[in-house]
Regions:
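Sensor-regulatory modules in signal-transduction proteins
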Residues: 141, 155-157
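Juxtamembrane extracytoplasmic/periplasmic/luminal helical "stalk" adjacent to the first N-terminal
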Residues: 14-69, 91-93, 133
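Helix-start (N-cap) segments at beta->loop->alpha junctions
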Residues: 167-172
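Short hydrophobic alpha-helical segments used for membrane anchoring or interfacial signaling
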Residues: 96-102
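A short beta-strand signature within small-molecule sensing/ligand-binding domains used
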Residues: 145-154
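Extracytoplasmic/periplasmic sensor domains and loops in membrane signaling proteins
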Residues: 70-84, 111-140
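Sec/Tat signal peptide C-region and signal peptidase I cleavage site
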Residues: 8-14
């Protein structure tokens, strides 16, 4: 019984395990991402993506086969929203910035992300609850392999969550 209690407590302890300076940085970027999520061009891109739906036949396994320089991949980084987030990602404290629609599908990105859809990932699930979120641990970013803390913020329209902006916050 005591072991069970320790195991139940341990995830909460892990969530508070970031060094204070890094935790402050993460909180700063959660606020910044909430501002970015409210950018009218980002909101418009997500609304359009939600109305249009995902790329026909695209899945995460097919996305892995898409070359980073292909027109399909480049469409996400060179769109109006893609160019905006590429500009924001020039901030070297983040190593990736991605916009997702209401189903977790890719809308725009600063670089080709590993996944086309991340609807089952905590970075998406938690922001879809309507509040900025950040992981409580440091791990290599799945796309960039840079040590990061994953963070996200909801994209809102009329009080409804319509998508997510997420980033890898560089830890070094």
């Amino acid at each position: 019984m005591m072991l069970g209690m320790v195991l139940m407590i341990s995830p909460a302890v892990a969530a508070d395990s970031l060094p204070p300076a890094l935790q402050a940085k993460v909180e700063q970027y959660k606020k910044k991402m909430a501002e970015w999520a409210a950018d009218p061009a980002i909101v418009a891109a997500v609304k359009e993506a939600n109305a249009r739906g995902s790329l026909a036949g695209m899945s995460n396994s097919k996305w892995l086969e898409v070359d980073e320089k292909s027109p399909t991949s480049q469409a996400f980084t060179t769109s109006k929203a893609g160019l905006i987030i590429k500009k924001w990602e020039e901030d070297k404290q983040i190593n990736k910035l991605v916009v997702r629609d209401e189903k977790g599908n890719l809308v725009a990105a600063s670089t080709k992300p590993l996944l086309y859809n991340n609807a089952i990932r905590p970075v998406y699930i938690n922001a879809m609850k309507g509040e900025p979120w950040a992981a409580g641990n440091i791990a290599p970013d799945p796309t960039t392999q840079v040590k990061s803390v994953q963070a996200s913020a909801p994209i809102m329209d009329g009080g409804k969550v319509i998508g997510v902006v997420h980033a890898g916050i560089t830890t070094e």
